[in-house]
Amino acid sequence: MQEVYLCLDVGGTEIKAAPLDKRGNFLAPVRHFPAMAGADRQTLLENFGWIFSSICPENAVPIEIDLAFPGPFDYKNGICLLQGLDKYDALYGCNLRRAFSEISGLLEQKIQFINDAVAFALGEMAFGQATQAGRALFVAVGTGCGSAFGVNGFLAEEGTPGVPPNGYFYNAPFRDSCVDDYISRRGLEKLSGEMLGVPLDGRALAERIAAGDERAKACFRCFGEQLCDALQPQIEAFCPDTLCMGGQIMASAALFLHPLEKLCTNKKITLYMTQDTSLRTMQGLTRAASR
């Protein structure tokens, strides 16, 4: 029987999942499942169990379950620490490694968790646009601002000059708050609420721009300036030669990325936009499994 890795990219709205082999090849198309993130603990665990069984091909045996999970999360011990973020509150304090082991029948050591931005970085360094990078910075803009740093194809070690603790800078001071409050979906919605009178996400803003709304265009430009300002200290501290940007908002990159493009040009940094972050994230999970 074929050995497979069951890989899940866990989001607050949906969970993307697929079986992969040890070389990072997809053995079936990526499937989308409702996250049910506001449900009770038992319902959530049953939902994960259903996903595990649904994506495992016939005549295949799962040898590992790998999950890209948003933080805060105790990745080493498999304990969910999400609380007060309107997603998976019922799993707070739950040992998901033990729970998923009981659900799947796999040994606990075969259930692995990794930060979603780190998985994205591993996928890009092994399969994507950063395979030749010497020093690479990875930023995924979604419900928050995820980040990771790479050196010569590997995650930067703790203590590497220019790399913040754990590779995270979502909580770095920025303007009157922190990076995460500005460079995120909620940051864009807050900005559009201030400028347009109604909170809009990236897709809704892009639709308004396509309809000729100049105020929506100005809002995206302002977001792009904030993004550049937030990343500049990290770029100057780490001195990457490659910057990979991910997240669903990258579908609208042409509407807001100009300030960052200009900064990268001035600093001779190669800038890449990843159109399907989940694909790279799931491939990155197989790299994490093989480490």
What are the residue ranges of the model-derived segments?
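Conserved phosphate-binding/catalytic loops in two-lobed NTP-binding clefts
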Residues: L107-I111, L257-T286
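Glycine-rich phosphate-binding loop and adjoining helix at the ATP-binding site
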Residues: P34-A37, R41-G49, V61-I65, G71-R135, ...
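Short glycine-rich anion-binding loops that position phosphate/pyrophosphate groups of nucleotides
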Residues: T13, P70-F73, G142-G146, I249
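Short, hydrophobic alpha-helical segments
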Residues: F52, C56, T286-R291
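Glycine/GP-enriched mid-protein hinge/lid loop-to-helix segment characteristic of carbohydrate kinases
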Residues: A18-L20, P29-R31, D40-R41, L91, ...
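Active-site glycine-centered loops adjacent to acidic/histidine catalytic or metal-binding residues
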Residues: D9, D116, G142
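Conserved phosphate-binding loops in N-terminal lobes of ATP-dependent enzymes
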Residues: Q2-G71, K76
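Adenine-nucleotide phosphate-binding core of ATP-dependent small-molecule kinases
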Residues: R31, M36-P57, V61-I63, S177-D181, ...
